[in-house]
Amino acid sequence: MRHDPGLAIVRRAARVTLVACAAFYLCRYVLDSVIMAPYALFGVVAMGVLSQIPGSPAARARTLLAVLPVGWFLVTLGTLLSVTTATAVAGMFVFGFAVAYAGVGGPRLVGLAAGTQLLYILPCFPPFDPGSLWLRLAGLTIGVLLLAGAEVTLWPDATPTPYRTKLGDAVGALARCLDAVADMWSGRPEGGERFAAALPAATDAAEALRPSRLPPGLRPASAGRRDRALASAAGSARLLLGRTVDLSLVDDPCAVTLPAAAALLRQTASCADAAADWLRGEAEEVPDTDRIAAALVEFRAARDATSPDGLPPERLQLGSLALSLGEWTKSMVAAIRVAAGAPILPDNTPASAQPGPLWFAYRSTAGLWWHRIREHLTPRSVYFQGALRLALALAVARLLAGVFDLSHGFWVLLTVLTLLRTSAADTRSTLRPALVGTTAGALVAAVVLVVGLPPTVYAIALPVIMLVGFAAGPLLGPGWAQALFTLVIAFVFAQVSPVDWRLAEARIVDVVIGAAIGVLIGLLAWPRGGSGELHRATGTFLAAAADVVRETVGVLARDAAQGGALPRARQAGMLAEASYALYQTERHPPAAVDWQATLVAGHHAVRGAEALLRGCPTGCLLPCLAPLTTAAEDVADRYAQVGAGLLDRDRRATAPLPQRPALDWPTDLGMQLYALADLRVWLDGLRDDLGRIASIPADDDLRTRVAHLADGAS
């Protein structure tokens, strides 16, 4: 119970066992087909055990029905390409890569990859018998249809909370924090108490959006417009909460335009609350951006009505923070409208800076999928690396099985499929229990086969062994899974063809060969896995963020042309997020770098630059170009230094920041002082973000937890 709360794993194992045995017995004993029976059983194993299908029971059933034609296609190709070893190996490499690389489309496709791989592996071995293809397809169809029906009728799993609802909870909690800060700024003493009470729940709700806190299938990571928009809105919400805490710490009753800032914050809270209602399904109408846009116009007008000349720069900070929150809220609401399929304003991003922040809203679905496929088609992408690693391993396994004429070469490929991990270290760590388990299972199977039990005994024992095996794997580890699956295979083959103790011997040999192939490929193809790529990807991301800082200040200060720094940084951030997601699935010693803080620093640079370029006039700060350039170069150089250190694995690059340079800021620029304050708030925030990279946050430090909330980090 401790390892399986609610008995979800046991229920799933029982459901798959019942369906697999029913399909196998129907084909073997009722329809009397030794060809259909294995395909019915392994079709259920492929889709019910090796595949991880998310969603409600009805959604999983629909997914099974939708993937059935893909299964027909792969079984047909495997059957036809088994004519020679060369064609089978070529097909294994091509389709092994294609099926694994399809995972760039999102975790839902990743969950189907291993199962669909098995559907090609199963028929790609001799004998070449295209005449039996219809029997193979019929067996697969029976198994998948029975499994689809069982998903909604036999001990169905609970429907998980949709991501949209979780996002609604986080945005609603954010709205309460914003409203409490507005009360604080309006002089209401209860505002501070309300904020202190609301912040823990808001932090928990925001952290619940982290990919690491979600089942893979619920993460909004597909190539489609809706998932991209939900992920963008979640990133804005998490960023907003972190900056709301910064606002709560600003205690300046003499701040310029304090009443206007409080009014803007209250409108921001109201817009966030309306967005939360729609996300949770409590409102039918999707909120628009008109209200927050009007509030931003009113705030700027109120701010422009007060001359900042001669005022200390610190008195302008609060208004700049409030303005940034309003801009990010506008971006969040726009992303939610995209997720809802509602119209949004035209994209006004300059051609030189395309694609813009919400570029995906203006692309077709086919265009979005092509963009996702193309952007990861690089050796620097962990999706590309993983697909190529698996395709090579499966192709080599199929080649050796054909060259040495292994009697059950299918098991070699199945071993590779189930044991190969993303790093060489993780692959090696799975070998010992897998080999020990396989050997133990094979010894028991050999004894049983030597004794020579009647087929009826195998038929009766199969469901029991299968149930325990399917439940033991997730609960007790790969050793138990391999041991019991070896027995399952022996009991299955004993019912479809004459076998003896040599079947167990072949099983051990095939698993050893498959394990050796997995280790060899793991050592040759990107052996560090996510760790090695994460250093490179995050280093590149921070270097790109440095260019964003320089370019943004250049555009706003001296009206320089906006180039491609932002699009490059968005692309680098996407690859860094993918690398971090893979890194989290692997085993690593305690990190010397806070990877969450590293990603947050990059995302804050990108999001802040987007807001500044939308809301600030360009070329208005020439009189203070020298100190502004010095401040920007200080931050950009630090980003570049940390990025280079990550690329070189130099821990000294993440050492605490030196003191910021002492600069003489003008106080007589008129209204342009507000634009200067907006820029300085952004740059100061980026320095704070960089200062957190060298330290690992304590789990119970609420302020630090909030500071590490941004975009998809972790």
Regions found by a protein language model. Give the residues of each.
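C-terminal functional regions that serve as terminal interaction/effector modules
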Residues: 463, 478-487, 499, 689-692, ...
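Gly/Thr-rich phosphate-binding loop signature of adenosyl cofactor/nucleotide-binding cores
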Residues: 603
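Cytosolic/matrix-facing juxtamembrane and C-terminal tails of multi-pass cellular membrane proteins
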Residues: 488-493, 511-516, 532-568, 572
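Long, hydrophobic alpha-helical segments that serve as membrane-spanning/inserting helices
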Residues: 1-17, 21, 29, 52-53, ...
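Cytochrome P450 heme-binding "Cys pocket" and the immediately downstream C-terminal segment
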Residues: 519-520
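Alpha-helical transmembrane segments and their membrane-interface boundaries
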Residues: 1-150, 154-155, 316, 327-483, ...
